């Protein structure tokens, strides 16, 4: 595997996916401090929004400390070389949110759908291209679709105007061979000028290995987060990815030492709990469950007395996907009733 001289764009997730473990309560000062550190370290693209994207502030997903406008308005003017991106999920974010992001100076918009629902992205992708934004299609929970199925979905996004398409391992479920099969097929099917990206999670400790496998397959954009701050066991840890790429001769443009300092000095101190592979986040990866379900399942555990792991396994069995957060509590109630019924039978 010789990737010497290969150039990739490292895309930071700390200030968007990292909002999940922060319960979307990151302060403006924290946001600005980390963004400036990433910018100074040479990170070229930084995502800033609610964890569930533009318009994510809601009862279903959680209310943030500040609005998307406030976060973006605070960060964008401070950037010296980095561009800022925003995530948008059709059905949560609207075309008005997209226009607002453009007006504030957002460079890249990533339109995200479930890996079988690319058709709902047409309006937003088409508008983003009309606004001359760097326009990315983002296929989530990619392990739930076959390589052939993902090819069809990626080509739809490309036809709407996406100049880059992401294969997204939202559950941290995929192994390197899964990544190669999917990204290899999609890379072959897309136009040569359409970029390919990969977004990984570290629930099975595969974040780095999967990202390198993606680069092997022609991916030129790779997502990562400082100190791994993200949903579940976190995203691919940025400082480790940059170091591995440096060892392999893959060019990121990110300073190996400065990015470590961002993680240690700025990100780790604001963590509400350690981002690590505990039994619940491991279960996310093993059972193929959407990463941001983790804290919802932990809350349901406290409320109904059903272990989060048991809830997550059941969610995986049911094939629940992002957007069905309201079903987590329903699942916990069902499991609690089943436990109570079983206990009564044993007692009898």
Swiss-Prot record:
The record marks 16 as: Transition state stabilizer. Mn(2+) binds at residues 17, 199, 201. This is 4-hydroxy-2-oxovalerate aldolase 1. GO terms for molecular function: 2-isopropylmalate synthase activity; 4-hydroxy-2-oxovalerate aldolase activity; manganese ion binding. The keyword Membrane does not apply. Its EC number is 4.1.3.39. Belongs to the 4-hydroxy-2-oxovalerate aldolase family. GO terms for biological process: catabolic process; L-leucine biosynthetic process. It comes from Cupriavidus metallidurans (strain ATCC 43123 / DSM 2839 / NBRC 102507 / CH34) (Ralstonia metallidurans). The active site is at 20 (proton acceptor). PROSITE patterns: PYR_CT (PS50991). Keywords: Aromatic hydrocarbons catabolism, Lyase, Manganese, Metal-binding. Coiled coil: none annotated.
């Amino acid at each position: 595997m010789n990737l010497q001289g290969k150039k990739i764009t490292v895309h930071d997730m700390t200030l968007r996916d990292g909002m999940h473990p922060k319960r979307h309560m990151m302060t403006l000062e924290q946001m600005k401090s980390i963004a400036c550190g990433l910018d100074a370290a040479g990170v070229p693209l930084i995502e800033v929004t609610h964890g569930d994207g533009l318009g994510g502030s809601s009862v279903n997903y959680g209310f943030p400390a500040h609005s998307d406008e406030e976060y973006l308005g605070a960060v964008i003017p401070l950037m010296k070389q980095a561009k800022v991106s925003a995530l948008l999920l059709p059905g949560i974010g609207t075309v008005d949110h997209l226009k607002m992001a453009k007006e504030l100076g957002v460079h890249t918009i990533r339109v995200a759908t479930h890996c079988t629902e690319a058709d709902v992205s047409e309006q937003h992708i088409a508008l983003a291209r009309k606004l001359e934004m760097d326009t990315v299609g983002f296929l989530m929970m990619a392990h739930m679709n076959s390589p052939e199925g993902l090819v069809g979905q990626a080509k739809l996004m490309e036809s709407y105007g996406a100049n880059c398409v992401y294969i997204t391992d939202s559950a941290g479920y995929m192994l390197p061979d899964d990544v190669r099969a999917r990204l290899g097929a999609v890379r072959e099917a897309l136009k040569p000028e359409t970029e390919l990206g990969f977004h990984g999670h570290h629930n099975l400790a595969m974040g780095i290995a999967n990202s390198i496998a993606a680069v092997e397959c022609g991916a030129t954009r790779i997502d990562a987060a400082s100190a791994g701050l993200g949903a579940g066991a976190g995203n691919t840890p940025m400082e480790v990815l940059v170091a591995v790429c440096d060892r392999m001769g893959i060019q990121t443009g990110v300073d190996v030492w400065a990015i470590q300092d961002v993680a240690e000095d700025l990100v780790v101190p604001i963590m509400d709990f350690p981002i690590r592979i505990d039994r619940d986040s491991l279960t996310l990866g093993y059972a193929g469950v959407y990463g941001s379900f983790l804290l919802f399942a932990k809350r349901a555990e406290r409320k109904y007395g059903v272990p989060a792991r048991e809830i997550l396994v059941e969610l995986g069995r049911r094939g629940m996907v992002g957007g069905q957060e309201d079903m987590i509590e329903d699942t916990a109630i069902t499991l609690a009733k089943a436990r109570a019924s079983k206990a009564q039978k044993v007692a009898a």
